[in-house]
Design a protein with these regions (language model features):
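C-terminal non-catalytic regions of proteins with extracellular/luminal or membrane-system context
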Residues: 1, 6, 11-212
Length: 212
């Protein structure tokens, strides 16, 4: 038996001419507006944000390429495309510029991990090559660190206090391998990346692409 609900979709709106308007230009603009209103500025020391026009950025973290658009299950709907943080910044080339060396490094690393069969959101933070770090610092004095987290219907953020509570969700077990103290905290690899970037750059911004 196949599960069919095509005739029972009260959330499939129709336009005045009877055509579906889901994913229309109007809906895309509405989604963009909702995303903007859902962003929260947690801290802005020395008024580093917003970036001045012409700012050069060295973007660090696998989250620059591994964009989390929603949680697992019904929260992660099928879409025609997504825009990663890296691609989004590049689309603003009239305003900021991104160091291409790091962009290529993270995009390739994330792509390679998924080709090896890594589950969504379970990619591991790669170590930044010393030579690449040196070139990025020569490019700019401003770094942008990206961190992402994925959650789903059967599991959510965990901490070291949750180690004794096991979920039946397979992804929960995968998460324990990647995030040593639970994914409320930085993994060891993420912590090393953050400390490395902080030591090399005088100006650092952190972007959290997280759910839960």
């Amino acid at each position: 038996m196949k599960w069919q609900r095509v005739k029972y979709q009260p959330n499939t709106p129709l336009g005045a001419n009877g055509q579906k308007v889901t994913a229309s230009k109007a809906h895309t603009e509405l989604s963009k507006q909702a995303a903007k209103e859902g962003m929260v500025l947690l801290k802005n020391e020395n008024s580093l944000l917003p970036f001045e026009k012409g700012t050069r950025l060295a973007v660090f973290g696998k989250a620059s390429a591994d964009y989390v658009k929603g949680g697992g299950g019904s929260g992660d709907v099928t879409v025609s495309y997504t825009v990663s943080l890296d691609a989004g910044l590049k689309a603003l080339s009239d305003y900021v510029s991104v160091y291409e060396g790091l962009s290529s490094f993270y995009n390739k690393n994330v792509r390679d991990q998924y080709e090896r069969g890594v589950a969504p959101g379970m990619t591991v933070e790669p170590e930044v090559p010393a030579e690449l770090l040196k070139k990025a610092r020569a490019y700019t004095d401003t770094a942008l660190i990206t961190i992402c987290r994925f959650s789903g219907e059967g599991w959510d953020r965990t901490s070291s206090y949750d180690n004794g509570v096991e979920s039946g969700e397979p992804m929960w077990k995968e998460s324990q391998k990647v995030f040593e103290r639970g994914d409320f905290y930085l993994s060891d690899a993420e912590q090393r990346m953050v400390e490395t970037v902080k030591a090399a750059f005088p100006k650092v911004v952190v972007v959290l692409n997280v759910g839960g």
